[in-house]
Amino acid sequence: MSRKMFSCDFETTTKLDDCRVWAYGYMEIGNLDNYKIGNSLDEFMQWVMEIQADLYFHNLKFDGAFIVNWLEQHGFKWSNEGLPNTYNTIISKMGQWYMIDICFGYKGKRKLHTVIYDSLKKLPFPVKKIAKDFQLPLLKGDIDYHTERPVGHEITPEEYEYIKNDIEIIARALDIQFKQGLDRMTAGSDSLKGFKDILSTKKFNKVFPKLSLPMDKEIRKAYRGGFTWLNDKYKEKEIGEGMVFDVNSLYPSQMYSRPLPYGAPIVFQGKYEKDEQYPLYIQRIRFEFELKEGYIPTIQIKKNPFFKGNEYLKNSGVEPVELYLTNVDLELIQEHYELYNVEYIDGFKFREKTGLFKDFIDKWTYVKTHEEGAKKQLAKLMLNSLYGKFASNPDVTGKVPYLKDDGSLGFRVGDEEYKDPVYTPMGVFITAWARFTTITAAQACYDRIIYCDTDSIHLTGTEVPEIIKDIVDPKKLGYWAHESTFKRAKYLRQKTYIQDIYVKEVDGKLKECSPDEATTTKFSVKCAGMTDTIKKKVTFDNFAVGFSSMGKPKPVQVNGGVVLVDSVFTIK
């Protein structure tokens, strides 16, 4: 018999000296009439012991702290051996919560346990966005979190409806996922399973063999993220009219059309020599460099005390640098920089194939373009979650919670633990091709480029640039979508900018449009780490390095659980 599954949520107090759950809610996934809303954590945990089901909280890192705190204070201890009256967790070294597995004992050989998962790992969006994007027949509401609610507080009709909506939105969304066969712990795992189902597990294991941990560690040194760069020419200055374009499904489009590695790599010494059987390669290289005039910098060096980790470099400084580079990255660097004192050390070479992901991407692109609501959003999730799964870190050493003397949770690093890599070379080359796509387009617009962010280019002026004029389309895979045209803008740093965007009213909503069609402008604030509350205080006049405001919630572990303390946010 399959286990029942429930969507759950807590509402909690906001005082450091009175941290507790004042309301809980649970609703059965696939049976929305089976739900309950109550006001006692003890009552909820009694139900958890009796139900022995799979529960989902949206952002388990927050709600899970109250559960683990309760378990510790009621005699349960952490253990990964499945002993009675113990609990196990999956919490990453970065503090991401994935699971709590509470074992109550055994009936014969059958384990009596309740497993709690994080629905945010399957649906990585706020509840309000899930309701909107999935076109669910209810929307997330609002309540005043700071209202006094003493122990035994009687839940008001408004609070009851708010909690019920929250758990129902997630219950409906997860039910849709599960009915599509998407039943893994994370969106990435769902996507990888879907790809294996199309390719077949047998062929997957042959095409993407397991590499040794030492080899994976070396190859992983060539793995880099998206290209995010602000042109110094426009930094901290108000800019006039401009345009923003972004690539439709950047990573899936590279997976669809670019030559990508497969099979076991071959190690080579020195400089890579052309090999038609193994045309893709990762080169370990030591060199000095100087940016050419009129070129965008593309070299970024992390975990090095001589360089800022988020800065793209114009020169190598006083000493040569050593990098692991795909042939895609290396060719781009050779075009953008003068290289000196080059030493080719060694590397890995790979067979190549185009179209490995064609059937998978065709399937989900069709759903994305022909469906609306939930199915469309699930298709986007499947398309965008796969590439990163290939480069999953095999080091899965986690954190273990424990109860400190003051009653709050502490965390220690657990025993070292590793899993098999998936196939890191694939993640390395997909991201390399993605950077190549964005950088090549930006470089062709060198006289206009303001800013790049992974899949987007921001340009001065209102003319479509020559390099993309024939590949502009709002939906086609790999084409550039014209996202917006702005009247004015100001960029301070990566992921920190504001724009007045030209808009017009369509069916009662403001839609981006050209300057000629515009009836007004919409003020847009993009700033990593800034809450919506603080964004409402931003203007063109005060948006600058040093801008400071209260309104950033900072989680603090206290006796009983977690309190979100109001703290200062500053643009640095």
UniProtKB/Swiss-Prot annotation:
Entry annotated with the keyword Cell cycle: no
EC number: 2.7.7.7, 3.1.11.-
Region (DNA-binding): 223-226
SMART domains per UniProt: POLBc
Record InterPro entries: DNA-dir_DNA_pol_B (IPR006172), DNA-dir_DNA_pol_B_CS (IPR017964), DNA-dir_DNA_pol_B_mt/vir (IPR004868), DNA-dir_DNA_polB_phi29_vir (IPR014416), DNA/RNA_pol_sf (IPR043502), DNA_pol_palm_dom_sf (IPR023211), RNaseH-like_sf (IPR012337), RNaseH_sf (IPR036397)
Keyword Transferase: yes
One Pfam short name: DNA_pol_B_2
Segments forming a coiled coil: none
Residues marked Probably involved in nucleotide binding selection (site): 251, 380, 387
Site (Involved in binding template-primer structures) location in chain: 90
Keywords: DNA replication, DNA-binding, DNA-directed DNA polymerase, Early protein, Exonuclease, Hydrolase, Magnesium, Metal-binding, Nuclease, Nucleotide-binding, Nucleotidyltransferase, Transferase, Viral DNA replication
Annotated GO biological process: DNA replication; viral DNA genome replication
Catalytic activity, as annotated: DNA(n) + a 2'-deoxyribonucleoside 5'-triphosphate = DNA(n+1) + diphosphate
Chain residues that bind Mg(2+) 2: 246-247, 453, 455
Marked site (Critical for 3'-5' exonucleolysis) residue numbers: 119
Binding site for 5-methyl-UTP: 251, 368, 380, 455
Region (3'-5' exonuclease and strand displacement activities): 1-222
Annotated positions binding Mg(2+) 1: 142, 166
Site feature (Essential for 3'-5' exonucleolysis) residues: 9, 11, 62, 119-120
SUPFAM superfamilies referenced in this protein's UniProt entry, alphabetically: DNA/RNA polymerases, Ribonuclease H-like
Note: This DNA polymerase requires a protein as a primer.
Protein family: Belongs to the DNA polymerase type-B family.
Biological role: Polymerase responsible for protein-primed viral DNA replication by strand displacement with high processivity and fidelity.
The name this protein goes by in its record: DNA polymerase
Record organism: Bacillus phage M2 (Bacteriophage M2)
Taxonomy of the source species: Viruses, Duplodnaviria, Heunggongvirae, Uroviricota, Caudoviricetes
Protein's gene: G
